[in-house]
């Protein structure tokens, strides 16, 4: 929801202070691995400032909470792992949107549309933006697969019992049928 508008404004305002400043932040987010970012988030947000819990997916006494309390508790515990999971995907999709929109802005059909007298904003929205969304839609399935399959390092750091941690523990315990099942399911999700 943020990647498309941010990539759009970065392409429209190319080489401005906004584009250069956000590019630095985006490349930092892309360069930092998710498990390192998770570790830094735990140190800063959980240990130093105690804003969020450091580990687990639920609090002690979760069963005694009401339905709204359970939803709030799960949301509260999932903020840091989600940030660690999604930052690199966010950076990748933002730069993908920017680069494809810039390619489409320089395409012949944009020059043709502008020479026909269509306003620049209309040509941008009707022609360039629509064609730039195709790679985003193509890559979205890959991002969802990575999110569902999980990162066993992030799940290990945050002590979340998920799909990635199941695969990690199966490798450590040499449980080859579970390893094969995890790999097969991950491969099916990638298709």
Residue ranges: model-predicted function:
Residues 1-18, 34, 64-191:
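Alpha-helical transmembrane segments of integral membrane proteins
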Residues 13, 46-56, 98, 102:
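Juxtamembrane transmembrane-helix termini
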Residues 48-63, 155-161:
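Peri-membrane helix termini and adjoining interfacial loops of integral membrane proteins
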Residues 25-55, 84-90:
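Membrane-water interface segments at the C-terminal ends of transmembrane alpha-helices
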């Amino acid at each position: 929801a943020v990647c498309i508008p941010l990539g759009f404004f970065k392409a429209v305002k190319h080489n401005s202070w906004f584009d250069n400043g956000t590019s630095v932040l985006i490349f930092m987010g892309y360069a930092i691995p998710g498990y390192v970012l998770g570790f830094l988030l735990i140190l800063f947000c959980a240990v130093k400032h105690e804003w969020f819990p450091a580990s687990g997916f639920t609090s002690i006494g979760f069963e005694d909470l009401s339905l709204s309390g359970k939803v709030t508790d799960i949301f509260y515990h999932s903020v840091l792992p989600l940030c660690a999971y999604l930052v690199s995907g966010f950076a990748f999709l933002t730069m993908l949107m920017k680069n494809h929109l810039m390619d489409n802005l320089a395409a012949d059909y944009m020059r043709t549309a502008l020479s026909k007298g269509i306003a620049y904003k209309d040509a941008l929205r009707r022609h360039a933006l629509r064609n730039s969304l195709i790679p985003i839609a193509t890559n979205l399935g890959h991002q969802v697969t990575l999110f569902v399959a999980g990162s066993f390092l992030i799940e290990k750091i945050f002590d979340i019992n998920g799909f990635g941690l199941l695969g990690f523990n199966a490798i450590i315990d040499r449980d080859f049928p579970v390893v094969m099942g995890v790999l097969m399911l991950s491969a099916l999700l990638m298709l």
